[in-house]
């Protein structure tokens, strides 16, 4: 498809209606390479966070971003299950932030503007390597947060093969650092997956979906204040959804594929936006994995809902679509945000497709309610702050309030999220993978009046594609969402929070301490 110079001059990055779709090929992020360290027993990686220029669209000017090794998304880690690696995450960023900072939020009033700490999302890891929000550090580790312990993080990868991702987690500015580009894939490889003959190598493609807005000069746009404006300026906003879709760092890209099966590793890395993904002609696909790894068996789907931070591995069979193009859509939106990317089935089949969609994937280890030694009731709610802005809270507490979730090592607990707000919240618990038990409607007015949970209907089982291991769960409005999990191998300080980043930063995050 040819595009003229005059078309380029008509493109206004701030106006999505002027941006042609499907003109940039989907990039595949570079693979992270270990630095060979003589004295190191384990593969050792040195990753630098740097400011860089990035081309979001062929008709955009270059955009200043922050990226791991100056790339957006950052380099993809390919690690083996049970193989320990070490990573030195280094801040080489300038002292001034790309985006407006609200200094009324936790962690921002007396701290440097540019702070970073890396969380591998979904990793089963010791607390000193988890990327605690207060373990932040500035350029060259000059200033460090109160829970900072070490410059080199250790990941044992003692968990199922899974699509994880890494991103910034600095207290009070996570939404800004992630939006600026500090995200990447972290893929754990499992021998079991090779035995299953799933699509692999160049037929296994990671897809990181985000939304962005741009100024007319191509720079990243992020709102400085609410509408109408709060008396604080800059001010956090209660939600932010950009007006373009970005996949692997490109605005509305396309991918050329062969007429065969592909595995796509999907990550919703957006700040606020949830997606319901489907192909324009209802072409079916098979979900084979959730956040924490393989499902017990594939689930055939025509659409897939992904909240921020949720992942899904899917297999799409293009074999009957030779010569055709297929648009992946977001059925949550009628406008430009309804388009994700395009697949063009135009490459010749390089060899016979020997990959499979197995009838069963892996055996499951059940967690039953009888195993739980404690059940916690946790309210998902909101209040109004001193500046008349909405402030989201977990269990009526702020980040700085004393820790109240203190599970014991090796214990099994049930957590029930009672959502009193009018929208869904993706709740992420660090350290663990959990199972969703059910969601159940309750009488909101009665609960707000006297705190009593009066159920108004039967418990609703999770959908088949939600029955695998999860680290992020959609807590629906007007529902009590119950999860069950075991706390094993590590004790110490972790967190749990809403993964709508504007909520996490204000003030929907709580400490969690695993005790002996």
Q: What do the predicted segments below correspond to?
A:
Residues 1-120, 124-143, 150-152, 229-264, ...:
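N-terminal, post-signal-peptide metal-ligating segments of extracellular/periplasmic oxidoreductases
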Residues 125-142, 209, 213-216, 221-368, ...:
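Histidine- and aromatic-rich segments of cupredoxin/plastocyanin-like copper-binding domains
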Residues 47, 87, 118, 168, ...:
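Divalent metal-coordination and catalytic microenvironments
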Residues 280-293, 420-463, 501-504, 513-516:
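Active/binding-pocket-proximal capping segment
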Residues 93-97, 107-194, 302-346, 421-425, ...:
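Extracellular/periplasmic metallocenter environments
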Residues 364-369, 374-436, 441, 469-500:
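C-terminal substrate/ligand-recognition segments
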Residues 46, 117-119, 276-278, 426-428:
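Beta-strand signatures of extracellular beta-sandwich domains
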Residues 144, 233-246, 450-472:
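Surface-exposed acidic, glycine/proline-enriched linker/cap segments
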């Amino acid at each position: 498809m040819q595009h003229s110079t005059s078309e380029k001059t008509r493109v206004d990055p701030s106006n999505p209606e002027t941006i042609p779709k499907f003109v940039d090929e989907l990039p595949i992020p570079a693979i992270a390479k270990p630095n060979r360290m003589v004295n190191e027993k384990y593969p050792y990686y040195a990753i630098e966070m740097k400011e860089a220029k990035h081309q979001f669209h062929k008709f955009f000017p270059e955009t200043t971003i922050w990226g791991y090794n100056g790339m957006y998304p950052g380099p993809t880690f390919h690690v083996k299950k049970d193989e320990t690696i070490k990573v030195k995450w280094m801040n080489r960023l300038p002292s001034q932030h790309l985006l407006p900072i609200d200094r009324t939020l936790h962690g921002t009033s007396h701290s440097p503007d540019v702070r970073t700490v890396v969380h591998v999302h979904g990793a089963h890891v010791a607390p000193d390597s988890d990327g605690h929000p207060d373990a932040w550090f500035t350029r060259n580790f000059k200033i460090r947060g109160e829970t900072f312990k070490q410059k080199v993080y250790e990941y044992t990868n003692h968990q199922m093969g899974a699509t994880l991702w890494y991103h910034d987690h600095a207290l009070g500015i996570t939404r800004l650092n992630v939006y600026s580009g500090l995200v990447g894939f972290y893929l754990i490889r499992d021998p079991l997956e090779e035995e299953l003959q799933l699509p692999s190598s160049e037929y296994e493609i990671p897809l990181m979906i985000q939304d962005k807005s741009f100024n007319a000069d191509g720079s990243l746009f992020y709102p400085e204040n609410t509408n109408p404006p709060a008396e604080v300026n800059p001010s956090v906003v209660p939600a932010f959804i950009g007006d373009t879709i970005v996949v692997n760092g490109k605005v509305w890209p396309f991918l050329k594929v062969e007429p065969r099966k592909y595995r796509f590793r999907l990550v919703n890395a957006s700040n606020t936006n949830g997606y319901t993904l489907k192909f324009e002609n209802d072409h079916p696909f098979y979900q084979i994995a959730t956040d924490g790894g393989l499902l017990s068996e594939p689930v055939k789907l025509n659409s897939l809902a992904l909240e921020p931070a949720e992942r899904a591995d899917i297999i799409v069979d293009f074999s009957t679509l030779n010569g055709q193009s297929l648009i992946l859509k977001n059925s949550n939106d009628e406008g430009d945000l309804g388009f994700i990317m395009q697949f063009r089935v135009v490459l010749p089949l390089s060899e016979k497709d020997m990959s499979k969609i197995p009838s069963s994937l892996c055996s499951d280890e059940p967690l039953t309610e009888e195993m739980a030694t404690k059940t916690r009731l946790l309210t998902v709610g909101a209040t109004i702050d001193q500046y008349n802005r909405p402030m989201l809270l977990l269990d009526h507490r702020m980040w700085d309030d004393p820790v109240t979730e203190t599970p014991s090592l090796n214990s099994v607990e049930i957590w029930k999220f009672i959502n009193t707000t009018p929208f869904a919240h993706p709740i992420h618990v660090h350290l663990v993978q959990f199972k969703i038990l059910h969601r159940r409607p309750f009488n909101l007015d009665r609960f707000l009046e006297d705190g009593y949970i009066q159920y108004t209907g039967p418990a609703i089982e999770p959908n088949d594609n939600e029955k695998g291991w999860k680290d992020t769960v959609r807590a629906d409005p007007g529902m009590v969402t119950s999860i069950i999990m075991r706390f094993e191998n590590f004790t110490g300080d972790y967190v749990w929070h809403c993964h709508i980043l504007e909520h996490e930063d204000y003030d929907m995050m709580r400490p969690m301490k695993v005790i002996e």
